[in-house]
Amino acid sequence: MYRIAADLHTHTLVSNHAFNTITEMARAAKEMGYCALAVTDHGPAMPDSPHIWYFYNVRRLPDVLEGIPVLKGAEANVMDVNGTLDLPSEVLNGLDWVIASIHTDCLPGTLTVEQATDLWLKVAENPAVDMIGHSEQAKHVYDYERVTKVFAEHHKVVELNGNSWAVRPEGAGNMKALALACKKAGCPVALNSDAHSIYQMQAGVGHLVRLLEEIDFPEELVVNSSPRRLLEELKLHNKPVVERIGGT
């Protein structure tokens, strides 16, 4: 049985279309028995997102809130087919957890498979990126088998996003093909809620668990399935946050 020991993709009301404070999100994660929570508000190119100053100042928050370690991160926006992100490296390198995602407000239109494949291959080379966010989207289908091999080589975690069934249903069907490619490539994945409120935490997790069970996905490749696996993954990313998370 797959379980989630930490959520690596959540938002707070700093992203104005979300609803809860970081303290409230941390408290809810603690009550769910999580070992850690990543708070990853949208990069500044996204409408309703925080100013770039936020991503400097978030590092000054306590490392532990409401009794749970908090990874202070960002969901950076991919801005073009060259894989350019909307936050500079000096900001990204100071964060605990960085997601790279495509949002249509920042990269409108539909990409060809070739364009999307090239885009993600370039993102894979960015050492500041830790995880690839909701990349199953219908408008940006890429060569999953080719790219997940490169993701694995560069220690990129591929997100399986529980919120996609609600907000990106047209692409949710691609999740199985993406997961199968990760299984074949030995590429790590994370099961996340992409919650924008405490009421969405664990959103879609049941769908994700059933999907992994259906394809007999190796539990050891699910990086947030236990504190130990999360700790091991963070060490691969050279994150100082490992000192705040116990690995059992």
Where does each model-flagged region fall?
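Histidine-centered catalytic micro-motifs
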Residues: 5-15, 39-42, 132-136, 193-195
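Extended substrate/RNA-proximal surfaces in nucleic-acid metabolism proteins
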Residues: 43, 48-160, 213-222, 230-248
